[in-house]
């Protein structure tokens, strides 16, 4: 269903889904080919990003998500691996409709979801509640990592990691990046607020 909904979203910052269907009992997606790399690759190459470049990439990500949220589609698995940077350096979000709701039971599988767990919103962890605000939380964690060079919560154990997201506030980016603009710090704090209602309602609101 999400894949079909994603196919109807026309936005330059979303990888286009051209067709969905079933063949020999298997579901398939026909998607746009993007020539480029994912954000994780760039993070590994650069270590950290300037505030200007971070805000550009985050802004393009939010623009893509705004179209999705208006169409009633929530991504549920925003992380650097799912943010593609095309050969012009622009964002294209991938894996709409491929992301599955994660339950606490699957989170306990050692190591499997460590990459995803670092970006999961508290309500996703506690209630399997997929919301536009959950996407924004993940975007905020990603921005935090781009500026600081690491995510705010770390652990080798995914269960410990998700416990931190549920029970601890995300530290201000100012604790990791001394002298950072107060407006940028406030913006990230808004995106990563622990309570759903304390975040912007959706990506369109976050952009205003």
Report residues per predicted region.
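Protein kinase catalytic-loop region centered on the HRD/HxD motif
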Residues: 62-73
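Activation segment signature within eukaryotic-like protein kinase domains
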Residues: 57-58
């Amino acid at each position: 269903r999400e894949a079909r909904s994603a196919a109807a979203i026309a936005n330059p910052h979303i990888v286009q889904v051209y067709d969905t269907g079933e063949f020999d009992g298997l579901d398939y997606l026909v998607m746009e080919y993007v020539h480029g790399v994912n954000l994780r690759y760039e993070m590994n190459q650069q270590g950290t990003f300037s505030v200007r470049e971070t805000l550009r990439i985050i802004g393009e990500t939010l623009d893509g998500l705004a179209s999705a949220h208006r169409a009633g589609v929530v991504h549920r698995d925003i992380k650097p691996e799912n943010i593609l940077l095309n050969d012009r350096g622009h964002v294209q979000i991938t894996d709409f409709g491929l992301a599955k709701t994660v339950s606490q039971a699957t989170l306990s599988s050692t190591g499997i979801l460590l990459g995803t767990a670092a970006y999961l919103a508290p309500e996703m962890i506690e209630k399997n509640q997929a919301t536009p605000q959950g996407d924004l939380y993940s975007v905020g964690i990603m921005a935090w990592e781009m500026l600081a060079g690491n995510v705010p919560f770390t652990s080798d154990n995914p269960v410990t990691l998700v416990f931190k997201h549920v029970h601890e506030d995300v530290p201000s980016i100012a604790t990791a990046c001394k002298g950072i603009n107060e407006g940028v710090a406030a913006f990230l704090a808004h995106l990563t607020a622990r309570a759903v209602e304390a975040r912007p309602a959706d990506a369109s609101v976050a952009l205003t």
